[in-house]
Amino acid sequence: MSESYRQTRNYENLNRCIYPGVGEFGIPELEPVHCDAETWIGFNYAKGCDVEDRPAHSVHFFIDDYQFNRLWTAPDVYLPMLSGFRCVATPDFSMYTDFPKAIQIYNHYRKHWLGRYWQDHGITVIQTIAWSTPDSYEWCFDGEPVGCDVIVSSVGTQADPECAELFMSGYLEMERRLEPSKVIFYGDVPDALKWRSNVCPVPAFQHELKKRIAAKQKAAKEKV
C-alpha cells in the first residue's frame, strides 16, 4: 500500500479516534452543554461570515447533506473555522424514513463522531436531535446527554399530516428520554408545542429570506 494512499484514505476517521461508544451500535457520547446563542446561520454561510462576526453567530446543519458531507471526509480542515463560532450544532445527516436502517444508524454515528471530535478540540457543541420512525427510538437518542440544551428542526415535516404526526411522536419521545432544558427550534413550531416554556424558536432561512425581500421591496417603494 503506497504512502500517498495511506494519507488520503480516511478509514471512516477511525485512524483519528475510536471513541468508547454507548448503546448497541457504539455511538460516541457527547458532553452536555448549554448554549446562549440567538443568531444561527447554516454551514453553507459559515465560511463567508467575517471572522470578527463569528463569535456572535452559531452554526446549524439544517441544509442538504451534500453541502456538509466534506466535514466527514476532511474533519480537520474545518476545525479552525468552526472554532470561531459561539456554538456549533452536530451535523444533521439525513434520517429519512425510506432510508435503509443501516444508513440511518451510520448517519447517527457520523453525527456523534464529529460532535465529539469537535468537543475534543474545544468547540462548544450542541446536539442536533433527529429521529425517523418509532423503531428508531431504540438507538437515535444514544450518545445524547440528558438535561441540557438541544436543537431540532421541523422544516419539511408540517405540511403532510403523516409527517407531522411522526415529528410529534419523536419529539415527545425526545422529551421523555432526554428531558432537555432548552429546545432551540428551527422552523415552524407546532401548535401543541408553542406553550412549552423551554422552546426557543429560530426562524428558518426561508422565513428570514421573505422578511429581507419584503424589507427591500418596502424600501424601494419609499424611494419612489
Label for each model-derived stretch:
Residues 68:
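An active-site-proximal beta-strand-loop segment
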Residues 47-52, 63, 71-214:
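Eukaryote-skewed repeat-based solenoidal scaffolds used as protein-protein interaction platforms
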Residues 54-56:
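A short, charged/proline- and glycine-enriched loop
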